[in-house]
């Protein structure tokens, strides 16, 4: 894979670009923090689990939807999936599908998320329209 930055410009490159350029493995805990920051506005509560072990290959995220449902999510290179129906609890017998994005996963779990995300998108488009862009 080709990256549009030189090694001396790594400080200007995104995290994903640095990982590709340096041949590094992504730290799933950092990825999980980015996921949380990206959609926190559209859920009641969301945070990286401090009680379940996270590392380079897996991280766990606790999320409470606007409907009050709680989930424990597993984040790996394969994507995100529900692994429990309460915070910090992995149910090994639970069989759920991986989602490539947090948006897809939350869209399948929470009508409130869908509404909040849609409203935020409309507000942003309206601001762009008002600014003449």
UniProtKB/Swiss-Prot annotation:
- Gene Ontology biological process terms in this record: regulation of canonical Wnt signaling pathway; regulation of Wnt signaling pathway
Q: What protein is this chain from?
A: GSK3-beta interaction protein
Q: Which domain of life is it from?
A: Eukaryota
- Looking at the Swiss-Prot or TrEMBL record, what is one Pfam family this protein matches? GSKIP_dom
Q: Which keywords are on file for this protein?
A: Cytoplasm
- Family per UniProt? Belongs to the GSKIP family.
Q: Which GO terms fall under molecular function for this chain's record?
A: kinase regulator activity; protein kinase A binding
Name the InterPro entries on file. Answer: GSKIP, GSKIP_dom, GSKIP_dom_sf
Asked if Cytoplasm is a keyword of the record, the answer is yes
Q: Where in the cell is it found?
A: Cytoplasm
List the record's Gene Ontology CC terms alphabetically: cytoplasm
């Amino acid at each position: 894979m080709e990256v549009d930055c030189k090694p001396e410009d790594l400080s200007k490159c995104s995290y994903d670009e640095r990982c590709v350029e340096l041949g590094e493995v992504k730290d799933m805990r950092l990825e999980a923090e980015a996921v949380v920051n990206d959609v926190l506005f559209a859920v009641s509560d969301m945070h990286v689990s401090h009680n379940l072990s996270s590392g380079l290959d897996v991280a766990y995220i606790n999320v409470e939807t606007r409907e009050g449902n709680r989930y424990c999510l597993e984040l790996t290179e394969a994507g995100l999936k529900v692994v429990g129906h309460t915070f910090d609890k992995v149910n090994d017998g639970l069989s759920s599908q991986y989602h490539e994005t947090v948006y897809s996963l939350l869209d399948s779990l929470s009508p409130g998320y869908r509404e909040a995300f849609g409203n935020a998108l409309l507000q942003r488009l309206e601001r762009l329209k008002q600014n003449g862009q």
